[in-house]
């Protein structure tokens, strides 16, 4: 979990890190509170009874104060260069006239001890451009967008 948090901190004041302690029996609550004390205004600890992954995500959405929301599980981390590139693009888009509902990026499965990375690419979607669902084309059976690849707008 700490690797995840440390990978998100370079976002600075532009990023609000919500750590949802979903009734964990490990040190999650303690670690969340520690980071909230160390990084006030950036990290917030949310404590709740266990409701499963979906309820933890919903708690994050309910408590988010920023314009965008992204799920990063505690055993995941973000690549620094990709993260900076995405934050730069989101800043540009937030300052413009275009209202962005979702930002979809490739997602890399990189398991420790496994030699090959698996990259989730969305070849049926237009690349490097803003598009509507009408332009997205059709998804085939078995195709989906992985939740971890999406950054969602929090406001209508």
What are these language model-derived features?
Residues 1-156:
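Nucleotide-sugar donor-binding/catalytic module of glycosyltransferases
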């Amino acid at each position: 979990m700490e690797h995840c948090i440390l990978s998100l901190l370079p976002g600075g004041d532009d990023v609000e890190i919500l750590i949802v302690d979903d009734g964990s029996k490990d040190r999650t609550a303690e670690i969340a509170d520690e980071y909230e004390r160390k990084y006030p205004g950036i990290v917030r600890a949310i404590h709740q009874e266990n409701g499963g992954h979906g309820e933890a995500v919903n708690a994050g959405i309910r408590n988010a104060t920023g314009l965008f929301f992204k799920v990063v599980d505690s055993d995941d981390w973000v690549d620094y260069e990709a993260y900076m590139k995405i934050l730069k693009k989101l800043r540009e888009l937030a300052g413009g006239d275009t209202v962005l509902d979702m930002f979809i990026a490739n997602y890399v499965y990189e398991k420790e001890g496994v030699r090959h990375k698996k990259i989730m690419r969305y070849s049926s979607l237009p690349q490097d451009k803003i598009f509507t669902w009408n332009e997205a084309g059709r998804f085939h059976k078995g195709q989906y967008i992985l939740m971890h690849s999406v950054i969602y707008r929090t406001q209508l």
